[in-house]
Regions:
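Conserved beta-sheet core of the metallophosphoesterase superfamily
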Residues: 1-94, 98, 136-138, 157, ...
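Edge beta-strands of extracellular beta-sandwich domains
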Residues: 60, 200-204
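Short edge beta-strand/loop segments characteristic of extracellular beta-sandwich folds
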Residues: 102-106, 113-122
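Extracellular Ig-like/FN3 beta-sandwich strand-entry sites
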Residues: 110-112, 125, 185-189
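Extended low-complexity, serine/threonine- and proline-enriched intrinsically disordered segments
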Residues: 124-155
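Cleavable N-terminal export/targeting peptides
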Residues: 133-140, 182, 195, 202
């Protein structure tokens, strides 16, 4: 027996049924068009298809097609530094500065040719495949990570505040539904395929 429960507020991690408010609307307010939760999940809701005892579900991101189930990042082009928050007071407490530094430490400038994949509705029964342009299958590692888009769209903007006195709310959290692969070189194209337990196939 499986019980599915919906919650209409912000959601993160695990299998999403709904995450309408994302970061309680903060990300879209600070960066128009970027409505995502603290783990990078787009604001959205679950679609349930029930026929007799047969049940299928899919997370639907608001304003996106059903096929939008993950986001990938070329980490050669993702990095954060103190230069991104010039308005942060120089005398801010160590605890507040360290809260921001977790993003700087997670994403320093590098050329390691790594790609981070955020599959926000990941389930252990799903499968992931990453193949490069030479048809080489690349191994992946499941990692805890911060979503770079949420950092840029919300956390950086909350910390870049001359009136900052404490750690802002709803900043980017570290979550488990991330995967990392390493390409042979910086210019290699990748085909990322995610297959759900119901056989739905998503490509990028």
């Amino acid at each position: 027996q499986c019980v599915h429960q919906g919650d209409g507020h912000r959601g993160h991690d695990g299998t999403h049924e709904c995450s309408v408010c994302a970061s309680w609307w903060w990300s879209g307010n600070l960066t128009p068009g970027i409505h995502i939760g603290t783990d990078g999940t787009p604001g959205g809701y679950g679609i349930w298809d029930v026929t007799g005892t047969d049940f299928q579900c899919l997370y639907k991101s608001t304003g996106w097609p059903e096929e939008y189930q993950f986001r990938s990042y070329d980490l050669n082009n993702v990095h954060f530094s103190m230069a991104d928050v010039p308005l942060m007071p120089s005398d801010i407490s160590a605890s507040v500065k360290n809260a921001y530094m977790q993003y700087v430490n997670a994403y320093p400038q590098n050329n390691d040719n790594e790609v981070l994949i955020n599959i926000w509705n990941w389930n252990s029964d799903w499968t992931l495949s990453v193949v490069d342009e030479n048809r080489k299958t690349l191994p992946y590692t499941e990692v805890w990570a911060y979503d770079p888009l949420h950092i840029a769209a919300l956390s950086v903007k909350r910390f870049n505040n001359a009136g900052l006195k404490s750690t802002p709310s709803f900043i980017t959290d570290k979550f488990t539904h991330f995967f990392k692969v390493k390409a042979d070189d910086a210019d290699t194209d990748l085909v990322i395929t995610v297959t759900t337990i119901y056989g739905f196939l998503f490509l990028n």
